Structure formats: C-alpha cells, structure tokens
Curated annotation (Swiss-Prot):
Gene3D superfamilies: Acetylglutamate kinase-like. The record marks 31, 253 as: Transition state stabilizer. PANTHER family: N-ACETYLGLUTAMATE SYNTHASE (PTHR23342), N-ACETYLGLUTAMATE SYNTHASE, MITOCHONDRIAL (PTHR23342:SF0). The keyword Nucleotide-binding applies. It comes from Magnetococcus marinus (strain ATCC BAA-1437 / JCM 17883 / MC-1). Keywords: Amino-acid biosynthesis, Arginine biosynthesis, ATP-binding, Cytoplasm, Kinase, Nucleotide-binding, Transferase. This is Acetylglutamate kinase.
Length: 294
C-alpha cells in the first residue's frame, strides 16, 4: 500500500477520535429507509456503520420503513394501494399486510443483516412491551385545491401517543442493537400503521438521545438552487416551508427534526443514505455530509 494512502487512513482516525470520545455512552436513533435498504453494498455499509458505533460505545436504535416492500406484497396479493396527501390509506386488509411485511419480513432481514456482519441485533415492533402506544390519526385535508377543509378517514393510520422505554432501556444496557418496526398499538389493542420518521423522533425524545438521524434519498435540505444547506435551527423550518424551499416529503422530516429538538434531542440530521458509510461520514468527520438541525 502506498505511504500516502496509509497517511490518509491515519488522518481519518485522528479526525474521528474526538467524536468517538464525545459520543461514548450516548444514544443515537437512526431512521433507516430508502435506497440504503435496497442496494446490497449500501446495506452492508449501513450494518458495518451501526456495528462500529456500538463498538465505540454509542447506543444505536434503528427504526425502519418499508413502503416499497409493502407495495410489492400488496400487488402480489391483488390489493390496490391508496394514498391521500402522501399517507397510505390503511384498511383491515392493508394493515394485515403492513404488519406482516414490517414486523415479520423487513425487521428480521435488518436484524439478520447486522448479525451476519458481526453485530448483535434483535427486532421488535411497537406491540412488544407496549413500546409504541398510539392513537388514530385525524387527518384534515387542506390546500390550494381544497376549498373547504375536510376530515379524511385514513383507516388504521396512527400517531404516537407515548413511547414505553422499558425494552429499549434493557437493550441499551446490553450489547444488542434494537431494530424497531413502526407498528403501534392502541388503548384497546388496535394495530396502527405509523410513519417511521415520526416514530424515530418520538423514540429519540423518550430515550433522551443525543442525535436523531434520518436516512433519505437526497443529499439533505437544499436551497432553491439545489445547494445543500449544511446547518439550520428551529426558526429556519417555518421559513423554508413558507417560501417553498422545502416541499413534499421533506416537510414532515423537517418537522420531525424540529419536534425532536424541542423535546431535548441535541442534534437532528438528514443525510443521503445513497452514500456508502453515510452514518460514519456524518458523525465522525468535521464537515459531515448532510443537514443538521441544532
């Protein structure tokens, strides 16, 4: 190996060491989704990143999505997906598929991925230990094309009511990395489909996490010229939404980050999961690769 390459590797370690020391014993909640869950190289890199985090004393908690996988199984079963304002309408049949795919398939695939790469992971859904307590979402449809706001019944779509931390606390005290499926449970045992970003944000608050990290399929928050915005604060969120800089699916992600920050999470990151080792590049380098809200 050329001496220059060896020197560069040493520089990387020197840059990372202060961050490793600073974050030892801290909890990071990571929303895992998008292309990082599909591409084989990215999947391996993600597993290696969270294992390294655990080995240097960071406590990662993974919350995952699974929209494309749900859509694929629904298609095979002859069920037609329906969305309103970007939210999946979840009737009884759809809820059965959602729970089966998220808790039974996607969750265990991620657990297996981490274990095969040398880590120790265990999966759970929000039903386990009554971890994600939920209520039915009341969705009000409004916008430029809606003259009179109307309440829409989305079926078994829920919002987080409360996070019970007992199981997650036990994982944190061990070497096991928890992998959480965003399926919640209601007061009467109802099953709810909940947005994974929202679940991650609420878990970050409940676990008093140092960081919330959302993996996406874009570089982060971008200005109107497509240039990455490296850092924002709470007051920037409404401005970016009002002036149209942030649109579509980035809006709820930013709102989740703001809610987490208000709830005591020190920093929330939106990063590009299409970049190999995106997690390590964001948390162990001076420049990072995405957008951080502090």
């Amino acid at each position: 190996m050329p001496m220059r390459n060896q020197v560069e590797k040493v520089k990387v370690l020197i840059e990372a060491l202060p961050y490793m020391r600073r974050f030892e014993g801290k909890t990071f909640v990571i929303k895992y989704g998008g292309n990082a869950m599909v591409d084989e190289d990215l999947k391996s890199a993600f597993a290696q990143d969270v294992i390294l985090m655990r080995q240097v004393g960071i406590n990662p908690i993974i919350v995952h999505g699974g929209g494309p996988q749900i859509g694929l199984i629904m298609k095979r079963m002859g069920l037609e997906p329906k969305f309103i304002d970007g939210l999946r309408v979840t009737d009884e049949d759809t809820m059965s598929v959602v729970e089966m795919v998220l808790a039974g398939k996607v969750n265990k695939d991620i657990v297996n991925l981490i274990n095969l790469n040398g880590g120790r992971a265990a999966g759970l859904s929000g039903k386990d230990g009554y971890t994600i307590q939920a209520r039915k979402r009341t969705h009000v449809r409004k916008g430029p094309d809606v003259q009179v706001p109307e309440i829409i019944d989305l079926g078994w779509v829920g919002d987080v009511e409360r996070i019970e931390t007992n199981l997650l606390d036990r994982f944190r005290a061990s070497d096991i990395i928890p992998v959480v499926a965003p399926v919640g449970v209601g007061a009467n045992g109802e099953t709810y489909n909940i947005n994974a970003d929202s679940v991650a944000g609420h878990i970050a608050i409940a676990m008093q996490a140092e960081k919330l990290i959302l993996l996406t399929d874009v570089p982060g928050v971008q200005d109107k010229n497509g240039t990455l915005i490296n850092q924002i604060d709470e007051t920037d969120v409404d401005k970016l939404i009002r002036n149209g800089t942030v649109t579509g699916g980035m809006i709820p992600k930013l709102e989740t980050c703001r809610t987490a920050h208000t709830g005591g999470v020190n920093a929330s990151h939106i990063i590009d999961g299409r970049v190999e080792h995106a997690l390590l590049l964001e948390i162990f380098t001076d420049s990072g690769i995405g957008t951080v809200l502090r």
